[in-house]
Amino acid sequence: KEILELYSNDFFRIDPSGMFLTLYNSIPSQLAKNNKFYITKVTNKKVTNKDRKFIFDLLNSKTILPFYKVNDPSLSLNETKDIDNFKLYLSDIGLFTTMLFNDKLSTNENIYIKLLSDKLDVNLGYLYENAIAQIIKSNDRDLFYYVFKNDETTRSYEIYFLTTDSNKLVPIEVKSSETKNHKSINEFSRKYSSKISRRILFFQDDIFHDEMLELRPIYLAPLTIKNFKW
C-alpha cells in the first residue's frame, strides 16, 4: 500500500488534474469486467488528444503493460497490431493484487495466505492473466492478443496471449481453475495449423497433454516462456 501511495503522489505531480491516477487505478476493475481498456469508460467522454497523451505518458512510466490486438497473425504480430485496440495490465503483480483488495478494510496478510492456498472466494482469472502478461514481458517479448470469428458461425473467440517460438505462433490461454476447456485454442489451431509451433494452456492442475495441447500448471509459466526461442 505504501508503494501505491508513492505512485499516487508521483502521478499527481505529473498530472494535478488526477486523470493520470484515475486511468491507472481503473485497470483492475476494467480487467475484472473482462473489458478491453476503453479510455471512454474511465473519462465518460469522447477521447481527446490530451487523453491520448495521458495514455502515452502512462505507457512511458513503465508502470503498465500495453497489450495490442493483432489483425492478422498469419503475417506478423508486430506489423499487424492495431494500436487503437489494446488492453492494459499492471507491470507488478504484487501491486495488482493489493489494488484488487484496496477497498477492503482487511487488506492484510490473510488475503495473501488465502490466495496462495487457493481459498479466496473470488474469480481470479484476470489476476493470473496479469501474471502471465508480466512473465511474457519480462522475457523481452511484446504482448499481443487475437479475436476472430468461426468461419461457419458468428461466434467470436479470443486468444488471450499470442507469442512465438522458433518463428512460429504459440497461442496461450490461462485459467484460474482446473478446467480443461480450450475451445478458442482449438479453433485457432484449426485455422492457423501450419503457422503454429506449440499451443499451451496454463491452469491449476498437473502437467497434462490433450493431443497437441500442452496443459501446464501456472507455476511452470516462467520456465516455459523463458525457453521459447526467437
Give the role of each language-model region.
Residues 157, 181-185:
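Residues at alpha-helix caps and immediate loop-helix transition turns in enzyme cores, especially N-
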